[in-house]
């Protein structure tokens, strides 16, 4: 059971290159507790990747690049080198005593962050998150909570949110459409904005089952 005073790092990243070797150009995060809410919130654009036109040409959401520049200009996001992003996140984790990191489909975020770390340091440093932080996965949690939920099942079938094998889908966008009652909600696919909805999914899952095991890797 996660104590309501336990600090949690919720993060999301956007990537370029290919799915097997993703490089992070956008990372947003919140540090929060269930009792106190948001303690820290930041949005970074990785200058080492974002300023490389060849790498960014393959970004799935490359059409958002002009908006990123506008956000950087108005202070909504901070353009910073990867080394400094990692350093600041580590300092925030230490300052607030972060125990868990969480993402929706956390295995991808973990792989993308570590792949970028190895690329940027030529594998001198291999892991992005500070040692000792445990990964939680809201995708795993949502599957446990919603797999037998009749209302969510009906919502998926009525809107054709199904896999090729006819099973319910559990993307953050679909889950949040159901949670919010907003059928036309579209995920931003920018780091910090996606963090905000994924935190609500996390809190919903814990409200349904406080003892849920959301760990990405289990002992």
Model-derived features: positions:
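Conserved protein kinase catalytic core
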Residues: 18-20, 143, 200
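A short, structured active-site edge motif that brings together acidic residues
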Residues: 45-50, 128-146
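Substrate-recognition/cap helix-loop segment adjacent to the acidic, metal-dependent catalytic center
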Residues: 108-136
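Conserved non-catalytic scaffold segment of RNase H-like nuclease domains
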Residues: 2-116
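Acidic, Mg2+-coordinating catalytic module of metal-dependent nucleases/exonucleases
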Residues: 100-107, 111-112, 154-219
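Short, polar/flexible loop-turn hinges at active-site or ligand-entry regions and domain interfaces
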Residues: 71-76, 122-129, 182-188
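Short alpha-helix plus adjacent loop in nuclease-associated cores
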Residues: 136-163
């Amino acid at each position: 059971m996660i104590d309501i005073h336990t600090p949690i790092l919720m993060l999301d990243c956007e990537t370029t290159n290919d799915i097997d070797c993703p490089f992070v150009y956008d990372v947003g995060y919140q540090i929060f507790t269930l009792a106190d809410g948001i303690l820290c919130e930041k949005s970074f654009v990785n200058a080492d990747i974002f300023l490389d036109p060849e790498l960014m040409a393959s970004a799935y959401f490359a059409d958002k690049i002009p908006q990123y520049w506008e956000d950087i200009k108005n202070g909504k996001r901070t353009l910073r080198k990867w080394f400094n992003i990692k350093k600041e996140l580590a300092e925030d984790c230490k300052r607030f005593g972060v125990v868990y990191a969480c993402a929706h489909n956390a295995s991808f975020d973990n792989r993308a962050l570590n792949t970028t770390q190895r690329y940027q340091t030529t594998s001198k440093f291999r892991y992005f998150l500070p040692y000792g932080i445990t990964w939680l996965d809201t995708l795993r949690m949502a599957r446990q909570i919603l797999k037998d939920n009749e209302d969510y099942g009906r919502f998926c079938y009525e809107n054709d949110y199904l896999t090729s094998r006819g099973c319910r889908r559990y993307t953050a966008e679909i889950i949040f459409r159901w949670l919010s009652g907003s059928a036309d909600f579209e995920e931003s696919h920018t780091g910090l904005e996606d963090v905000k909805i994924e935190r609500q999914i996390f809190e919903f899952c814990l409200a349904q089952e406080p003892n849920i095991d959301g760990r990405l890797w289990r002992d």
